[in-house]
């Protein structure tokens, strides 16, 4: 799920300065040359109003040009698409009343310009040998690929453990659904695990963006681990969203789950109320029945439209499991062949779920 607009700008900027891009190559050249730099990633009337001195260039961007221009005093201004160098050796004069927590002149200017213009600004420190990015109201130090990969691999190992636990609780839920023994606790535990896995994956996606071309293998591993998780998230909520709930639609509930604090996410009672369950302390032990979305999604070659019609017609998974071929054919869009496929598919799923739980 998408985060706030500031996060989108932040990630887009990280992608633009990721290893393997011409711009990152230019920054690395500046670092290796032991010089500093102040670079504004965008140009408009507001930026122009902060610029004094220097000279206009309007030439095509290249890493070598950026490196050579950084040798001069003053800031460099690039076009918003980073394809052209607009100005160089300019003196930036931001509003001194704009708050900043930085101490060095270059970094203070960078933070103020970023806040005042709402364009990303990069400050390359000659003394500390770091690249600091100021964007969307935050400061972020760009690390090398080795440091990012180390953090990403730790997060990936955590994701693998959480995914393994998710598969266990999801398998248990499937078996309980077949036996019609599901409680609110069982269903909410799966939603909780799905949200935890999604959050870890979202963090790893940030590393993938930051790594650029160095993040290809990490991206493939993430894709493999997260296959089907987002769909499972939606179907679990649709299966157990109480009828007439004030929580709203499944999409609204998923959005609220994404916005929950880490502390609230660990509390199953709070989680249950977000999904729409109401009641006292015994809310988690209340028995509930799924509609059947999760189970029907596992039947091969069954279109989503047909799944919706089957759920609308039968109402609960238990009625679906009890339905014969003739009963299934009564649903619009379900012919004899598809009815048999659904019947056999549900029977196999029921058998395998029970076996996995007890054998």
From Swiss-Prot:
Keyword entries, A-Z: ATP-binding, DNA damage, DNA repair, DNA-binding, Magnesium, Nucleotide-binding, Nucleotidyltransferase, Transferase
InterPro entries for this protein: DisA, DisA_sf, DNA_integrity_DisA_N_sf, DNA_integrity_scan_DisA_link, DNA_integrity_scan_DisA_N, DNA_integrity_scanning_protein, RuvA_2-like
Gene Ontology biological process terms from the UniProt entry: DNA repair
Cofactor(s) essential for the protein: Mg(2+)
Annotated DAC domain residues: 7-146
Residues that bind ATP: 74, 92, 105-109
GO molecular function, one term: adenylate cyclase activity
Reactions catalysed according to its record: 2 ATP = 3',3'-c-di-AMP + 2 diphosphate
Broadest EC class assigned to this enzyme: transferase
UniProt-listed Gene3D superfamilies: 5' to 3' exonuclease, C-terminal subdomain, DNA integrity scanning linker region, DNA integrity scanning protein, DisA, N-terminal domain
Disulphide connectivity of cysteines: none
EC number: 2.7.7.85
PROSITE patterns: DAC (PS51794)
HAMAP family per record: DisA
Family stated for the protein in its record: Belongs to the DisA family.
Quaternary context: Homooctamer.
Function recorded in the entry: Participates in a DNA-damage check-point that is active prior to asymmetric division when DNA is damaged. DisA forms globular foci that rapidly scan along the chromosomes during sporulation, searching for lesions. When a lesion is present, DisA pauses at the lesion site. This triggers a cellular response that culminates in a temporary block in sporulation initiation.
The protein's name: DNA integrity scanning protein DisA
Organism of origin: Frankia alni (strain DSM 45986 / CECT 9034 / ACN14a)
